[in-house]
């Protein structure tokens, strides 16, 4: 779709087919982040001292998913679950810190006691979506920084 020289971008190439150094612990969230970055054709290195002169270093400072349940009525049965996702990251090159940012997102799940397996599957999908949105946030800030320069 385009009009007057403006067009919508399908996706960003900021984190596509690059050599990336990712500094983080080995939590499930960080391992999923690595998996999604690899799926975009990136080579992921986990050591700081890797020869990556022009490459990007991603330092995950904080990566967390919190789950909360909401209940209403006299029986106080859980009717809804809330998932809060937070990733705090620093993007840098060997020479300088480019970006420090915290990305947060919240999603809600309807709770159905009779279909817990379905809810678990839906939660796994939401986690993948949270991480994908976190990567898009990184790409957005990298593109913004490139446009400033």
Name these PLM-found stretches.
Residues 2-42, 146-149:
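A structural "domain/chain start" motif
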Residues 37, 41, 91-95, 138-146:
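Sec/Tat-exported extracytoplasmic proteins
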Residues 43-54:
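Short acidic low-complexity segments
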Residues 56-102, 108-124, 136:
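Surface-exposed short loop/turn segments
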Residues 121-146:
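Short, well-ordered alpha-helical segments
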